[in-house]
A protein has these predicted regions:
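Active-site phosphate/pyrophosphate-binding segments
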Residues: 264-268, 272-300, 390-519, 592-612
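Hydrophobic alpha-helical scaffolding
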Residues: 7-10, 121, 125, 139-143, ...
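Acidic/histidine-rich
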Residues: 157-191, 466-492, 529, 534
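Generic C-terminus detector
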Residues: 231, 546, 559-561, 571-612
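Conserved short alpha-helical segments that host acidic/polar catalytic motifs at enzyme active sites
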Residues: 1-254, 266-273, 277-297, 336, ...
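Glycine-rich oxoanion-binding loops at beta->alpha junctions
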Residues: 68, 72-85, 275-291, 314-350, ...
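Glycine-rich phosphate-binding loops that contact phosphosugars or nucleotide phosphates
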Residues: 294-436, 440-443, 523-569, 587, ...
């Protein structure tokens, strides 16, 4: 949430900052601003409410802001309404310190009251202004360096933050600090970059540093110097990002979401190839030993949103194949109850960005309990990846659309691979069954591609039902887990009220909501549960519901029971979620397009939720 970009070099900063901010639009925002400095000249600050286009128009695409050092920001309102006044950057009373901030400062009112007593005035309703003026206060009080001032402020600020700050006395320099909020620093050819996320600077460099938690850095003269909380210099390793710049572009598609839907065969294949060697799974890179796998007493899966839905699939698959008890938790609830973790529990945290605040907090809670942790993440070097004991990296590449597609699909692959390996190592599966399932797993990319070839039927159905008032998704077992994701996809980008229910629960209250014309979508890929779910759908139809059924090739009898049928290739039922979800992703996309909505940037949502 929110986006930060910074630049120091020989080129004009403003166009680079605007370009970087445009790559962070998926994070969600309601206003934007730039602060640019040309040598010793005063900092120029320009802000605009609304889309980035308004800021670009104000600055003639950055041409009117001259200078080679600057910071930019897209704001998601937390403290104070969306407005030009509340937009970042913010500055001290005399303009000595200018900065931008991502996160939430929990004790901002306390800090603000202190600063008012010291003679400071406030023009905005934001917590960020308090942080910038606190840094200014300590800079003047101790007459030290910017690092000293930021250090004193960090000790007194409670909450999460990523800060990028410029000082009037230090032209051509940017200072950054972070606590529990993502930030990366890039370098190339004597120039330095700051960003909240990789896509913002991928066009300019793939050489990056990950600044550690509770650390600071100084960017100047094409180099980065790191400091710990004591102000001592420390070293950080330079990392090369393997993504290419083209991966963060639309590539001829109308929307990033449709591009990413079509990238799923490759993303799934890449994730599989990263862990399959000579016809067997090789999870040595993940880090769990066979002894540790054999000793697992139970698994806790912790995640948010679509990643939580992956956990719901994992629960069915892991318990059935590996015969390990699996519990799933919403990350935002995990640490607010007395979680009873057995000594040999394994906590699996799933997060595309590796920066999801609630998931990161849950990971830390698990580590404090002394249990083993494993992260399934897409971003190398992210906070969750760095702090987990073991990491399974998915190979989805950059995902720009707010509504996840390929990250979800690669996370499914990760849990399938873990389930197979756990089952084999724990003696719950023989070699023949293991080889058969592994071969089946490798057919998923081709089968996803086959589903995408028939997307026009989904488009027709979506257009016909784009004005639906309520939509209910139902299923049993893995199909219920897929229904959760299908419902989320529809509601988050089309704004249609949608819910998912275990099909057997309909009769316990929900069926009272079914009326003439209500759209009910049933997922029926589990052979043993097919008849039961079909019976539940018939109950809905008798009450006037309009039915869509999603099942496997060969189950053509469904056409006698539903108004519209969608088929996916047959596959072992443990892996059916990977195929069943594709038509539901397409449905959400096409309904949103038919309603004329912004598919990639739905209202009120952010791609990476980095505040609790």
């Amino acid at each position: 949430m929110c986006g930060i970009v910074g630049f120091i070099g020989s080129h004009q900063a403003a166009p680079i900052l605007l370009d970087g901010l445009s790559k962070l639009e998926y994070r969600g925002y309601d206003s934007a601003g730039l602060a640019v400095r040309d040598g010793d000249a005063p900092v120029q600050i320009v802000k605009a409410k609304g889309r980035l286009k308004a800021l670009a128009e104000k600055t003639n695409n950055g041409e009117t802001l001259k200078g080679t050092c600057g910071i930019g920001h897209t704001r998601w309102a937390t403290h104070g309404e969306p407005s030009e006044t509340n937009a970042h950057p913010h500055c001290s009373d005399d303009g000595n310190v200018v900065g931008v901030h991502n996160g939430i400062i929990e004790n901002y009112q306390e800090l603000k009251d202190k600063l008012v007593r010291k003679g400071y005035t406030f023009y905005s309703s934001t917590d960020t202004e308090a942080a910038i003026k606190l840094i200014d206060y300590y800079y003047k009080k101790y007459e030290g360096t910017p690092v000293d001032a930021i250090n004193h402020a960090m000790v007194r600020i409670r909450g999460s933050y990523a800060l990028a700050v410029m000082f009037r006395d230090y032209p051509g320099e940017i200072y950054v600090a972070r606590k529990d909020s993502p930030m990366i620093l890039g370098v190339t050819d004597g120039e330095c970059y700051v960003a909240s996320d990789v896509p913002a600077i991928l066009k300019y460099t793939r050489q990056v540093y990950y600044i550690g938690n509770m650390e600071m850095a100084r960017l100047a003269d094409g180099a980065v110097t790191f400091y710990n909380l004591d102000g001592d210099e420390i070293s950080r390793e330079l990392t090369e990002i393997e993504w290419d710049a083209e991966a963060a572009e639309k590539g001829g598609f109308e929307h990033f979401m449709m591009k990413e839907i079509h990238e799923q065969p490759k993303a799934v294949a890449d994730t599989l190839s990263s862990v399959i060697r000579d016809g067997r799974l090789d999870l040595s890179g993940v880090g769990l030993t066979e002894e540790e796998i054999q000793g697992i007493s139970q698994i806790h899966i912790v995640a948010c949103g679509s990643a939580y839905h992956v956990g719901a699939v994992a629960q069915y698959v892991m318990e059935d194949l590996a015969e390990i008890p699996v519990l799933i938790d919403v990350a935002s609830e995990f640490r607010y109850r007395k979680t009873l973790l057995a000594p040999k529990s394994l906590v699996i945290v799933i997060s595309q960005s590796g920066e999801t605040a609630d998931s990161l907090a849950a990971l830390r809670e698990a580590k404090q309990c002394g249990v083993k942790t494993l992260a399934i993440v897409n971003v190398v070097g992210s906070s969750i990846a760095r702090e987990a004991d073991n990491v399974f990296y998915t190979m989805a590449g950059p995902e720009i659309a707010v509504a996840t597609t390929k990250a979800y699909s690669t996370q499914l692959i990760a849990v399938y691979c873990l389930a197979l390996q756990f089952a084999l190592v724990r003696g719950k599966m023989d070699e023949k069954r293991y080889s058969t399932l592994l071969e089946e797993l490798q057919t998923i990319p081709e089968k996803i591609g086959k589903i995408l070839e028939d997307k026009e039927r989904i488009q027709w159905f979506a257009a016909k039902n784009s004005m639906a008032k309520d939509v209910f998704f139902i299923g049993r077992g893995v199909d219920y887990a897929v229904s959760l994701e299908g419902s989320l996809k529809l509601k988050e980008i089309s704004y249609i009220h949608s819910e998912a229910y275990a099909a057997g629960e309909l009769k316990h209250g929900t069926i009272s909501l079914i009326e003439n014309g209500t759209l009910v979508i049933g997922v029926l890929t589990q052979e043993q549960l097919y008849e039961k779910t079909l019976s539940n759908m018939a109950e809905c139809r008798s009450r006037g519901a309009y039915l869509m059924g999603l099942t496997s090739y060969g189950r053509y009898d469904i056409e006698d029971a539903v108004n519209f049928a969608v088929y996916v290739p047959r596959i072992d039922e443990h892996f059916a979620a990977s195929l069943a979800v594709i038509p539901l992703q397409l449905l959400g996309y096409y309904v949103s397009v038919a309603r004329g909505l912004d598919v990639d940037k739905p209202r009120n949502l952010a791609k990476s939720v980095t505040v609790e």
